[in-house]
């Protein structure tokens, strides 16, 4: 894999660990739908895994009451366990599978319990310290691409075998 150049203030996703790291960050994470703030925290858990942009898990208590509805379907992560999907419902608008969580995470990832990650491409705005995050390509992965991360990123064309 040919790595993208890393500029000042950037980090390469190719320096992230596998299995992933999961650490609380003081960054301000804001998620908006239909002009409403549905999540706002400075206590998100930032998960970093080789070849993926970071994913931010928001503690459930920092998500607006009543906006999450459990969705059908599930998937599994070899590291974190079985994922539960969530729809976001705001002002009569339903965004299917807008986020996911690990309700019974695997050992080593217990601190993700009760936190929800949002797909930045499915909500109206996903902000990291005020910067709009771009979605990770491909639709399955939920990484948040900001100016501080360099790729290339899994999910882009030709990355299926990574």
Positions of predicted regions on the chain:
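Terminal leader/tail segments of proteins
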Residues: 1-162
């Amino acid at each position: 894999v040919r790595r993208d150049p890393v500029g000042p203030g950037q980090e390469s996703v190719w320096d992230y660990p596998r299995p992933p790291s999961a650490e609380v960050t003081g960054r301000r994470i804001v998620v908006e739908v239909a002009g409403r703030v549905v999540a706002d925290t400075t206590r998100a858990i930032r998960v970093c895994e080789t070849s993926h942009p970071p994913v931010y898990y928001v503690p459930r208590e920092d998500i607006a009451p009543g906006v999450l509805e459990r969705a059908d379907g599930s998937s599994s992560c070899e590291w974190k366990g079985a994922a539960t999907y969530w729809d976001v419902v705001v002002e009569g608008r339903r965004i299917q599978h807008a986020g996911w969580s690990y309700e019974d995470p695997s050992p080593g990832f217990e601190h993700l319990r009760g936190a929800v990650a949002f797909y930045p491409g499915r909500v109206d705005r996903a902000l990291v310290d005020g910067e709009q995050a771009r979605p990770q390509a491909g639709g399955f992965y939920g990484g948040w691409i900001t100016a501080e991360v360099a790729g290339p990123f899994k999910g882009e064309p030709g990355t299926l075998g990574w």
